Regions:
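NAD(P)-binding Rossmann-fold cofactor-contacting core
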Residues: 27-49
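Structural signal for interior beta-strand "rungs" in well-ordered beta-sheet cores
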Residues: 101-217
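Phosphate-bearing ligand-interacting subdomains
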Residues: 45-108
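Short, solvent-exposed amphipathic alpha-helical segments in soluble enzyme
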Residues: 22-26, 89-91, 225
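Short glycine-/acidic-enriched loop or helix-start segments at secondary-structure transitions
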Residues: 18-19, 50, 83-85, 203, ...
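Glycine-rich adenosine-cofactor-binding loop
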Residues: 3-23
Length: 225
C-alpha cells in the first residue's frame, strides 16, 4: 500500500504534536511507512520556507487546493485562533473526505468510540468506550475522554485534561490544559474553560469560565470578545 501523502495546516505548537504522531506511526514499520509527510501550510508569510520538525512550510493554506493527491489535517488552535477553525478548514478548499484522522500510536481509542474526520488525538490520550469525538477536533497529549462523553466539531482539548463520563462539550469550544470536567456537565458551543479549572456546573455557550470550582470570568478579565 502506498503511503498517504499528508499536509499539516499550521506551523504552531499543535502542529508539532501532529507531526510527531505522523512520524511515530511511520516508525512502527519503517520499511512500509504509513504517511509521506509532504509539508506544512501556514498563512504567516514569515514562516514560508521554515522547517517544522524537519518539514517545510510550503505556502499559505489556500494552496491546499493545488495539492490534488494529498490529505490534510488542521493543527491551528490556540486561545487566539480557536474560533477560526471552521473558517480555516473552509479556506483549505478541499472536500471533507480529504481530511485525515490522526491518532498517535501511544494514544488509545476504544473500538466502540467514534472519531470524526480531520481529528487529531495525540500521545498518551485515551478515548473511552461509547465516547463520540466530532470532526476537526484537536486533543492534545495525556487527555482522557471518558465513557459516553461527546466532543463537538472543531473543539480543542488541551493537554492533561480529564473529561469524566457523560460530559457534553459543544462545537468550537476550548478547554484549557489540566482541567477536570465533572460527570454530566455541558460546555456550550464556542465556550472557553481556563487552564487548571474544575468544572462542576454547565458553562453556557460563548462564555469564559475558570477556577476551582470554575466560575464565569467578567469580560474585563479576558480578551476573547
Amino acid at each position: 500500500m502506498k503511503p498517504v501523502r499528508i499536509v499539516v495546516l499550521g506551523a504552531g505548537g499543535n502542529s508539532l504534536g501532529i507531526l510527531d504522531a505522523l512520524m511515530a506511526a511511520n516508525a512502527i514499520e519503517p520499511a512500509r511507512p504509513r504517511y509521506e509527510i509532504v509539508g506544512v501550510l501556514d498563512d504567516i508569510p514569515a514562516n514560508l520556507g521554515r522547517l517544522v520538525l524537519g518539514h517545510e512550510v510550503l505556502g499559505p493554506i489556500a494552496d491546499a487546493a493545488k495539492l490534488g493527491d494529498c490529505r490534510f489535517v488542521n493543527g491551528i488552535s490556540s486561545l487566539e485562533s480557536f474560533r477560526r477553525i471552521p473558517e480555516i478548514v473552509r479556506r483549505a478548499g478541499v472536500a471533507p473526505e480529504r481530511f485525515e484522522t490522526v491518532v498517535h500510536p501511544r494514544a488509545t481509542v476504544s473500538a466502540s468510540a467514534r472519531v470524526g474526520r480531520g481529528t487529531s488525538i495525540l500521545a498518551g490520550s485515551v478515548i473511552a468506550p461509547e465516547a463520540m469525538v466530532g470532526d476537526h477536533v484537536i486533543i492534545l497529549q495525556n487527555t482522557s475522554v471518558n465513557h459516553h462523553s461527546r466532543i463537538g466539531d472543531h473543539a480543542t482539548l488541551s493537554a492533561g485534561i480529564t473529561v469524566l463520563g457523560y460530559v457534553d462539550i459543544g462545537a468550537n469550544a476550548f478547554v484549557g490544559g489540566g482541567s477536570t470536567l465533572a460527570p454530566r456537565v455541558r460546555v456550550g458551543d464556542s465556550a472557553v474553560v481556563g487552564a487548571g479549572s474544575v468544572v462542576i456546573r454547565d458553562v453556557p455557550a460563548g462564555r469564559v469560565h475558570a477556577g476551582n470550582p470554575a466560575r464565569e470570568l467578567p469580560r474585563s478579565q479576558h480578551a476573547l470578545d
